[in-house]
Structure formats: structure tokens, C-alpha cells
A protein has these predicted regions:
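Viral RNA-dependent RNA polymerase
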Residues: 1-511
């Protein structure tokens, strides 16, 4: 806290004009206008965000705060964020930089590093603990003038331990978790992110001595939201420190010269260690959802295609597959389209000039990234199809260049009207064997025979695992995960069981 604010009590809340300037989307301006005439209630309202995922997983819960609380708290959070962005001694804050400057910061911190640790917090908002909340209170007390402290602490306390209400009127308690729609989300998540790295260094020993505060501060990398990149930090100690604060951190150690540096979903080349700032997006993730969007009134498919193409043309025109696709769209349109009437709904960063975007000059490593993510892409089929496209509408019907994978889930999940069932891992084979032993229709004579029986079924499943497909009612074998084959049931396809349409799914409130 002292490193963040060498001089205490320097900040005051921003004026209301700043809030109006920053929160210009229609949904945001409605909240601001409501704050002038409404009295706050003490309940959080939430809804599920409409977005694509790479696998079946719980949807993200978006929480909307009472209007007056949000507007007043925004004044303080903008003041805090502006300070962190502008302070010369804070070099690790990613959101104070343009995308190009973020890439340059990465090359700077890797220049003399022996290794680096990309990091990502899981369920960051949902795992904020009491001790993290106390850290935030300490920051607010030191940052703001004494005349403001009581108000900002009161506003801060109104961000958690509240009753929540979903769109379908299911009540829940928020606990100390962070409300996703709170003004504090971006700034505090980033500060907490950097703090965990700082605390890790302070808990580390060099030559038998704990790292001093000044040294720990100087060793910080770059952080933005739940993403981080820290040079030369011990990844085991890093995860252990996060756990001490109730947080879930995933790390990976990348040695100098190796491919694998990732930050803010940008994949950097192996030459980033030697000053090359070029990168590509997470191609698997972006290709998997490029063709999707929420239903927007008055927006037709070709228009959305051009808007997405315009955005990715700025950041990934030289990335394989995706860059080729968006470049073709721009070519067939006769050039990049201007910002449309729906400019406030387009991809984040679309308004940043190309000279300030992430550098994306062509590099062979982009193909290495893509081939690792999607090893069986049919490049020839894609190139042939793309060359045959002579208008924008033809781009809306691409061929299948990668076989789809079977949905892998920890819980029964509805996927396109089917129920995807949990994968049975090899560690559960003994349990499955015991279940088979107790099955009167399929009972081997001994437990040993049951294990052999299950192992045989796994072998059959493995033999029928072709290109990620599922055949004959048998499940998937890959990455150590298996589904025990079963006899095909009526209307059973791809290892998925069709649920009767009139019945409820397993989603909350009867929604699947």
C-alpha cells in the first residue's frame, strides 16, 4: 500500500461529468439518469451474460448495482484508476497503455529474464475473500483525503455481503465476492493481481534473506484484470501465495527462448525474449466464436461480418486462417468499413488506430500456436474455399476444416438440446468396476474381473476414437479422459442423450 501511494491522502472523487463521459453506452446512461430521481434499494440484480465458451461451463453472472451507489462509487474508482494510470512509479498497470505499449512492456520485462510466468486467476470475482477486502480498505484509507474516507469506505462496504436476485427471482447471498458490474472490478482486480505477485516476492528468499520491499516492487511484470506476466518468479510459491488469500491462480513457467508467452489472450513468438513485440490472438478461441453473436435488432449477418472483420483486421490481419478470412472480407467490401451506427456494440479496441494496436507482422510461430491448438486443420480446403468466394455472402458459408470435438464437462450440461454427460477419468475406474460388480445384468464373478471388464471397455473406446469423433455409442478417449462405452440407446448420438423437449433441463430456474 505504501508503494502504491508514497504520499497519502492525495485523491478526491472525480466530478459527475467524468462519469457521464466514461459511461456513454445507452444501458449505462440510463443508470446514471435514474440515480438522479430514484432511491437506492439494497438488493443486487443479476443476469447471465450472453457469450460463447470453448467448452460447457457455468455462465457468467453479471450483477447490476443500485444506480446511486454505482454513480457515486464510480467517482472514486475513476480517481483511483487515473492515479494508477498516471503515476510514473507504477509501470505494471496494463490498462494505462495502448496495445502496442503493452507489447513493448512485455519485451522490456523479458529482456534479461531467465524465465517468465504467465498467470491467470480462475473465478477471480467469485473468490475475493475477507483479507482481500481488508487490503482494499487499506488502499482507500491511504489514497483518499480524510474528508472523503468515510464516504468511500461506506460505498465500498455496499459492494458485497448483499442479497442478490437473478432474472428469474432466485435469491442468493453475494458474500465477499466482487459484483461483476461494480465500478471497482477492473482497477481493484488489477491491483490485487499485482499485489499477489509482490507478496510472492516478499515471501521468497534470495541467498537466505527475504526479498526487500524495493526489490520486490522492481520485479513486478505487467498485470491487467485476472491476467499477469511476471519474470523470474517461483510459480509454486506464486500459486501458494494466491491460495493464502483465498484465490485460485494458474501459472506456467516458460523458459527463456521458448514459445508460450501469453498475456491478455495474445500469443507472443519465441523471439519476444529478444525484443520482438509481434503477437496473434487466441486463434482457437476466436475462430470458435467468430460466426456467433447475440441477436441484435436491425443488424444483419453481413453487417456483423464486416464489423468483426474490421476489428480483427486491426489486430490480426497476418494471423493464419482468421487473418486470411477478415482480409478477404475487407477486400470484397472494397476496403475497411467505417464505424457503423452500432459502433458502441463492436469489439473492444476497435476505435484504436492501427499504429497503436498490437503488432502483428507475420511470424512462423503463429502457425505453431494454431497447430498446437487445432492440429488437424485442413488448410488446403480452407484456401480453396476462400479463393472461390466472390462476394460477402459467400463468406457466410465456410466449410468444416476441423472436426468438432465432443463436449467435455464435469456436470450434465445441455449442449444444443442434448445432454453432455461427465467424462469418467481413469482414476475412477475402480469405482466404475465396483458399480459393474453390483450390476445384476452385467456382473463379473470377482472384482478383479470387473476391473478387467472396465479396462476392456476403455480399450474399445480408445480403438473407436477417431479424429475426436464418437462412434457406435462409445465415448471419447483423449488427454487421459475416457467415457466408458455403453449400448446405444434410442436417440443417442455422439455419446449424448436427447432430453424430452417438454421436460425441464438442468439449468437454473428451468432454463437450459
Amino acid at each position: 500500500v505504501n508503494k502504491l501511494f508514497p504520499k497519502k491522502h492525495q485523491l478526491y472523487p472525480e466530478d459527475y461529468d467524468m462519469v457521464y463521459e466514461k459511461q456513454y453506452r445507452p444501458s449505462q446512461t440510463r443508470i446514471i439518469d435514474a440515480a438522479a430521481v430514484q432511491t437506492d434499494h439494497d438488493i443486487f440484480k443479476s443476469f447471465q451474460k450472453k457469450e460463447c465458451y470453448g467448452m460447457p461451463k457455468p455462465p457468467r453472472n453479471i450483477t447490476t448495482l443500485p444506480s446511486t451507489t454505482k454513480v457515486e462509487y464510480s467517482r472514486y474508482m475513476y480517481a483511483l484508476a487515473n492515479y494508477v494510470k498516471e503515476a510514473e512509479h507504477i509501470e505494471w498497470y496494463a490498462f494505462s497503455r495502448t496495445p502496442r505499449q503493452v507489447a513493448e512492456r512485455i519485451t522490456d520485462i523479458l529482456a534479461n529474464a531467465e524465465w517468465a510466468v504467465p498467470s491467470d486467476f480462475s473465478k477471480f470475482d467469485g473468490t475475493i475473500s475477507d483479507i482481500v477486502r481488508e487490503l482494499e480498505r487499506m488502499i482507500l484509507r491511504r489514497a483518499f483525503h480524510p474528508s472523503c474516507v468515510a464516504e468511500v469506505l461506506d460505498l465500498h462496504s455496499n459492494q458485497f455481503n448483499k442479497t442478490g436476485l437473478t432474472r428469474f427471482y432466485v435469491k442468493y447471498l453475494s458474500g465477499t465476492s466482487r459484483a461483476s458490474g461494480s465500478p471497482e472490478t477492473s482497477i481493484f482486480n488489477t491491483i490485487v493481481n499485482a499485489f499477489i505477485a509482490y507478496a510472492t516476492w516478499r515471501l521468497s528468499k534470495v541467498d537466505g534473506e527475504y526479498v526487500e520491499p524495493d526489490v520486490a516492487w522492481s520485479k513486478l511484470g505487467v498485470y491487467g484484470g485476472d491476467d499477469g506476466l511476471t519474470p523470474d518468479i517461483d510459480s509454486d510459491m506464486y500459486e501458494k501465495t494466491a491460495k493464502m488469500f483465498g484465490l485460485q491462480l494458474t501459472t506456467e513457467t516458460i523458459m527463456r527462448g521458448d514459445l508460450g508467452i501469453v498475456f491478455l489472450s495474445r500469443f507472443y513468438t519465441s523471439d519476444v525474449w529478444f525484443g520482438d513485440p509481434n503477437s496473434c490472438c487466441d486463434l482457437r478461441r476466436q475462430l470458435g466464436k467468430f460466426h456467433t453473436t447475440v441477436k441484435l435488432q436491425g443488424v444483419v449477418p453481413v453487417e456483423k461480418l464486416l464489423e468483426k472483420s474490421r476489428a480483427f483486421y486491426l489486430t490480426d490481419r497476418n494471423s493464419p486462417i482468421l487473418g486470411q478470412l477478415v482480409s478477404k472480407a475487407i477486400e470484397l467490401n472494397g476496403g475497411a468499413p467505417a464505424m457503423s451506427k452500432h459502433h458502441n456494440l463492436v469489439r473492444f479496441g476497435s476505435d484504436i488506430p492501427v499504429e497503436n494496436q498490437f503488432p502483428n507482422e507475420y511470424r512462423e510461430d503463429y502457425h505453431a500456436v494454431l497447430d498446437k491448438q487445432l492440429p488437424n486443420i485442413d488448410y488446403e480446403l480452407f484456401d480453396t474455399w476462400l479463393a472461390s468466394c466472390n462476394n460477402l455472402y459467400s463468406l457466410l458459408s465456410p466449410p468444416l476444416i476441423v472436426e468438432p470435438e465432443v463436449a467435455v464437462t464435469k456436470h450434465e450440461t445441455v449442449v444444443d438440446g442434448d445432454v453432455a454427460r461427465p467424462i469418467v477419468t481413469s482414476t475412477k475406474l475402480e469405482t466404475v468396476a465396483e458399480n459393474e460388480t453390483n450390476n445384476p445384468t452385467n456382473r463379473p464373478s470377482r472384482v478383479h474381473d470387473a476391473r478387467a471388464f472396465v479396462a476392456g471397455r476403455v480399450a474399445i473406446a480408445s480403438a473407436h476414437h477417431v479424429r475426436g469423433g464418437v462412434h457406435g455409442g462409445r465415448g471419447t478417449v483423449g488427454d487421459g479422459n475416457v467415457t466408458i462405452p455403453t449400448e446405444r440407446q434410442p436417440d443417442q448420438r455422439l455419446g449424448l442423450r436427447r432430453r424430452h423437449r417438454r421436460g425441464r433441463g438442468r439449468g437454473g430456474n428451468g432454463n437450459s
